[in-house]
């Protein structure tokens, strides 16, 4: 009996050690709003933040090294369908190694320029009817890469990231004759106290397209001030230039979001957008929000206004 108890104790200890060395997490969010988008006359339910279900994992390999993975499915909660007809793991699907050297990921992921710079400057985080992030993307930048490699590392307040993927495919992984080079992007960010500064440069893979983005944030009491600019050329060899100014102001459980962005493509002002919004936290994971966006550029003359009233639950 004592031997059986001892054996059970040893097995339990080994099982506990194994589970401590490996972990899998499940997360995501569901978001739905009533409203309309700038440039569209359609009113109804929609999901601008991108409802998602994701899985992530980490296995300790010893010596300070770990195997990591991440997969994310995007879906439309109003219909229950996938947002992509071709990619089930449309958000990302990567596997990699992490250690003292940094992190290497292989597969499909966000570009360094997008996730580390362009998305960080928008006070709306690219979500809702008032989102301003599109100005910094300037019709040039890609949100994701496919069939690629990504490396990133952080040393103190300095973070660096670089990704490169196969030429001849777009950011969904499908064949695309306009992508003649190997798409790549790189970013450097620096954070010290209330100050955050960022730089990125990228070539999304076309013969002529390239884009440089600068970003800054400054925390001041309950407010975070944001600024960004992008400059480059698109694949038609037209110059693009954009500016963004924004702020988030925290008031108790509420978050006031506001900003303004412009984009000029060649000689045409293709975006002049104002966004204002209010998000209210019902709990740590659930919030309600209201957002208004208006674009005075000629391209949106017929439908210059967008708005949404929604609820978001994170899990």
Model-derived features: where do they sit?
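Outer-membrane beta-barrel proteins
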Residues: 1-315
């Amino acid at each position: 009996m004592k031997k059986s108890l001892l054996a059970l104790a040893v097995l339990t200890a080994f099982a506990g050690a194994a589970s401590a060395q490996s972990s899998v997490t499940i997360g995501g969010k569901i978001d739905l709003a009533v409203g309309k988008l700038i440039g569209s006359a359609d009113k109804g339910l929609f999901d601008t933040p991108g409802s998602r279900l994701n899985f992530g994992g980490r296995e300790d390999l010893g010596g300070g090294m770990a195997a990591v993975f991440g997969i994310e499915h995007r879906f439309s909660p109003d219909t229950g369908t996938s947002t992509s007809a071709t990619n089930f793991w449309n958000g990302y699907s990567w596997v990699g190694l992490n250690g003292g050297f940094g992190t290497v990921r292989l597969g499909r992921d966000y570009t360094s320029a997008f996730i580390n710079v362009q998305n960080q400057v928008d006070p709306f985080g690219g979500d809702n009817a008032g989102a301003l992030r599109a100005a910094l993307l300037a019709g040039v930048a890609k949100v994701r890469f496919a069939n690629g490699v990504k490396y990133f590392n952080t040393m103190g307040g300095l973070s660096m990231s670089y990704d490169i993927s196969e030429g001849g495919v777009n950011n969904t992984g499908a064949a695309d004759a306009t992508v003649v080079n190997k798409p790549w992007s790189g970013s450097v960010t620096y954070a010290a106290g209330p100050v955050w500064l960022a730089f990125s440069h990228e070539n999304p893979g076309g013969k002529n397209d390239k884009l440089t983005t600068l970003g800054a944030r400054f925390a001041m009491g309950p407010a975070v001030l944001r600024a960004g600019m992008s400059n480059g050329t698109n694949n038609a060899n037209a110059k693009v230039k954009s500016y963004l100014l924004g702020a988030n102001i925290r008031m108790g459980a509420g978050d006031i979001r506001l900003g303004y962005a412009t984009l000029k493509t060649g000689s045409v002002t293709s975006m002049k957008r104002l966004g204002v919004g209010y998000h209210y936290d019902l709990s740590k994971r659930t919030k309600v929000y209201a957002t208004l966006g208006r674009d005075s550029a000629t391209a949106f003359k017929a439908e210059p206004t967008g708005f949404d009233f929604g609820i978001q639950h994170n899990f």
